[in-house]
UniProtKB/Swiss-Prot annotation:
It comes from Solanum lycopersicum (Tomato). This is Signal recognition particle subunit SRP54 1. The NG domain, also named G domain, is a special guanosine triphosphatase (GTPase) domain, which binds GTP and forms a guanosine 5'-triphosphate (GTP)-dependent complex with a homologous NG domain in the SRP receptor subunit SRPRA. The two NG domains undergo cooperative rearrangements upon their assembly, which culminate in the reciprocal activation of the GTPase activity of one another. SRP receptor compaction upon binding with cargo-loaded SRP and GTPase rearrangement drive SRP-mediated cotranslational protein translocation into the ER. It catalyses: GTP + H2O = GDP + phosphate + H(+). Residues 297-496 are annotated as: M-domain. It is found in: Cytoplasm; Endoplasmic reticulum.
Length: 496
């Protein structure tokens, strides 16, 4: 996944800087050059990258820093802040409210994945207790209604539209919204015709649909492959209708995702979701601070809980969250997380653990890593329930290991390798022991409980050392004003 490559490049640059014996101007320049190269390859605008590098050098004036200052931490924090600045539009997204029907209108270019994204958006909210419905007001593209109907049926979401009998998109939108309001749907999503920037007639149609239904929110859906051109496209749509938020699609397959995100931010339009694949659950809430935290290998604890809630069946969530908060990590949980990794890619569950973002799927070796997960899962398929659910690896005696190897058609040393991987992951997940993880995804509760003692448990020793140990961590949290801000830096506080 391209985002993982960008994150891997940036986190490696910071790691190399941290490993240097002495932090001098040469080391700082090498670090910034690597980060600059990675951002330019992601199609981030040259001026933004240049300004970021200049700002970091101003903040991190090595000659003026008094002895005793932690230069590594100051550099890391400056990189974090500047990346957030590039991606932050400085304007919060509109918040939908339960209890009253909200109408959301989707607009976008042809081929951006708008119709599929409508269903993903509805599905995301349906899993969180909303009652969504879909209205197809796209009468321009042949097959638009059939596509929406197929997607909605698969996701078990009610839909409204007409393939042949009605050709007026305004009437379809108005009738559909009224129908679903009567059925007490609290999230009504209207899909409009996809269009090109220069198509004046279709832009006029979009305005008419908007004026007729007066949506609470207009979402612009944009393909990440257009990169820096996102600025012009987003501006064109903003001039026609009141775009309140943006969803960037196809972030899994293009090198220009960083450029698209940064240029959308320049239009002051908040990005609220990113599409990371074709499947219904390959759809992530976009929040700048957790996103940057993950790119830098700092993790995203709030995203971890949200991902668990997305992937694990509702009735199993409390049990899994409780096990993780107790530090229990079994082979069965590892099996399930490998399944999640295969579904979600490298920016899935493991990337949300601090200091662990790129280890499971190294850059350029994604297919090799996926094949390894499948081999491990085949071995675990030959295990008993007792073996899968035990937290004591010693029960896997030599005779059991030989039985597992025979049953899975693998070699004994491959089973041993899988068990070593399990021990390593169990050690990392044990860092979550003692954290009060909310069972219903209330991340404000997690933020309130995230004091310096708890934070030190989940930070890798190397990162804790970089910020000056427990004393440095406490001072940093004090300087940043609150535990909530600290959670922001290390990936928390990400809501819907």
């Amino acid at each position: 996944m391209v985002l993982a490559q960008l994150g891997g490049s940036i986190s490696r640059a910071l790691q190399q800087m941290s490993n240097a014996t002495i932090i001098d101007e040469k080391v700082l320049n090498e670090c910034l050059n690597e980060i600059t190269r990675a951002l330019l390859q992601a199609d981030v605008q040259f001026k933004l990258v240049r300004d970021m590098s200049t700002n970091i050098k101003k903040i991190v004036n090595l000659e003026d820093l008094a002895a005793g200052h932690n230069k590594r931490r100051i550099i890391q924090q400056a990189v974090y802040n500047e990346l957030c600045k590039i991606l932050d539009p400085g304007k919060p997204a509109f918040t939908l409210k339960k209890g009253k029907p909200s109408v959301v209108m989707f607009v976008g270019l042809q081929g951006s994945g708008k119709t599929t994204t409508c269903t993903k958006y509805a599905y995301h909210h349906q899993k969180r207790g909303w009652k969504p419905a879909l209205v197809c007001a796209d009468t321009f593209r042949a097959g638009a209604f059939d596509q929406l109907k197929q997607n909605a049926t698969k996701a078990k979401i009610p839909f409204y539209g007409s393939s042949y009998t009605e050709s007026d998109p305004v009437k379809i939108a108005v009738d559909g919204v009224e129908t679903f309001k009567k059925e007490n749907c609290d999230l009504i999503i209207v899909d409009t015709s996809g269009r090109h920037k220069q198509e004046a007639a279709l832009f006029e149609e979009m305005r008419q649909v908007s004026e007729a239904q007066k949506p609470d929110l207009v979402i612009f859906v944009m393909d990440s492959s257009i990169g820096q051109a996102a600025f012009d496209q987003a501006q064109a749509f903003r001039q026609s209708v009141a775009v309140g938020a943006v969803i960037v699609t196809k972030m899994d397959g293009h090198a220009k995702g960083g450029g698209a995100l940064s240029r959308v931010a320049a239009t002051k339009s908040p990005v609220i979701f990113i599409g990371t694949g074709e499947h219904m659950d390959e759809f992530e809430v976009f929040d700048v601070k957790p996103f940057v935290s993950r790119l830098l290998g700092m993790g995203d604890l709030s995203g971890l809980v949200n991902k668990i809630q997305d992937v694990v069946p509702m009735d199993q969530q409390p049990e899994l969250l409780q096990k993780l908060s107790e530090g229990h990590f079994t082979l069965r949980i590892m099996y399930e997380q490998f399944q999640s990794m295969l579904k979600m890619g490298p920016l899935g569950v493991f990337s949300m653990l601090p200091g662990f973002s790129a280890e499971m799927m190294p850059q350029g070796r994604e297919k090799e890593s996926q094949a390894k997960f499948k081999r491990y899962m085949t071995m675990m398929d030959s295990m008993t329930d007792e073996e899968l659910d035990s937290t004591n690896p010693k029960i896997l005696t030599e005779s059991r290991i030989m039985r597992i190897a025979r049953g899975s058609g693998r070699l004994v040393h491959e089973v041993m390798e899988m068990l070593e991987e399990y021990k390593r992951l169990a050690k990392i997940f044990s860092k979550m022991k003692g954290l009060k993880i909310p069972k219903k995804g209330d991340m404000s509760s997690l933020s309130r409980n995230m004091n310096a003692q708890n934070m030190s448990k989940v930070l890798p020793p190397q990162m804790l050392k970089q910020i000056g140990g427990m004393g440095g961590l406490q001072n940093l949290m004090k300087q940043m004003g609150s535990a909530k801000d600290m959670m922001g830096m290390f990936g928390g506080g990400g809501g819907e």
